[in-house]
Amino acid sequence: MELKRYQKAVIADLTRYLQLLNQTRNYAAAFRLFWQEKSAPSLGHYQDILPGVPNLCFKVPTGGGKTFLACNAIRPVFDALPVTKTKAVVWLVPSDAILTQTVKSLKDSNHDYRQKIDVDFGSRVEVYTKQELLNGQNFNPTSVTEQLSIMVLSYDSFRGRGKEGLKAYQENSNLAQFAKVLGKPENPIQDADETALFQIINQLNPLVIVDESHHARSSLSLEMLTNFNPCFVLDLTATPKKESNIISYVDAVQLKAEHMVKLPVIVYNRDKQSEVLIDTIDLRRNLEKRAEAEYQKTGKYIRPIALFQAQPKGKEDAATFEKLRDELKNAGIPAEHIAIRTADVNELKNVDLLSPECPVRYIITVNALKEGWDCPFAYILASLANKTSQVDVEQILGRILRLPHTCQHTQPALNMSYVLTSSANFNDTVQRIVKGLNNAGFSERDCRPVSYTHLTLPTNSRV
């Protein structure tokens, strides 16, 4: 997979900053000079939230390929550091869902992410989970000096002192060799044993990549980042906090120009939940007909998927989802076309949604997909909240924005995404969708409310 033009520009921005950093030996001065060269000196105020550590941010909208950018950023950062530097990376993620997805892609030698890293580091790469690190699996003083070591970890597993967090602070005989080789730590972590995993990572002085970094700005998060003793911190987010040192901005227009996202979002309102259900089925079937025509013309396979955002009573109760499954089956949908994905039920585990053999066309959820789940085939978000309830779509909207095959399709309807709702306050729903777009790095210009009741698919790219 090649970098898109805007992604090449992001890596070029990082590389130029690193050149200035090596010239000035001052990360704040390098940041100021970088933005002076860009004729934007007002952006050059560096905010030193981690004293002594360069801390930069890529601002990239949802669907812009933040993970691939991070993979491409590792080599330039280490190239700018002394050649004797141990090549260790801590890759922090905010949720178990994103953790699972990131580990899977980085461990897969056939995945574009891993292939890029393998090319940059001569295939001398090892990717670790926290448990593998605690067990010392292929993790020892010799291996870390001979390879790039990527440790994929969740914020919570190091941010707190709960049962899971404590394991990283405790004496660990599996890592005793490190303590002998590395010696006394220069920056000891309070209450951490010298053989503790957290202390060992601290002494490796890693590059820290913070995915969805807007989640990592609490005092606990900053303490965690400090304890990692990073040599460099790279933040990735669509919505940076005001204290972020943004080194490269990606505009939504650039994503649209490179055919990365399905925009605009077409929003339909219906009088009843039952109408949302039936119209979602009709809309998805019509999209699948367009997808079949696209396949005949271009050979690119797409199987449009609809996400039903159910509204449970209180907690995510199984009865709500099973009732919706029954309603879909009563409407003629085969059982194998339906999957439930909630906090407690995961029928998508080990399912390859992009495979032509996969039958899934409808996914029932609440907010379990709000982070860490990506499927470009997801085209429709259908909210089944009560008419009087607020339609909480902003957290899950980003799941339907990625464009399959990252190319413009000949069928215009396949280049857009769709939301159906039965809200009594349609304007409020639209504003929530706009908020969701803002959270993903887009704007209200990317939302198209449709007032007419007849369900029609766009026939051209201008809606």
Please annotate each region the language model reported.
Residues G52-L56, K87, V360:
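Pre-Walker A (Motif I) flank of P-loop NTPase domains
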Residues G52-N72:
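Walker A/P-loop
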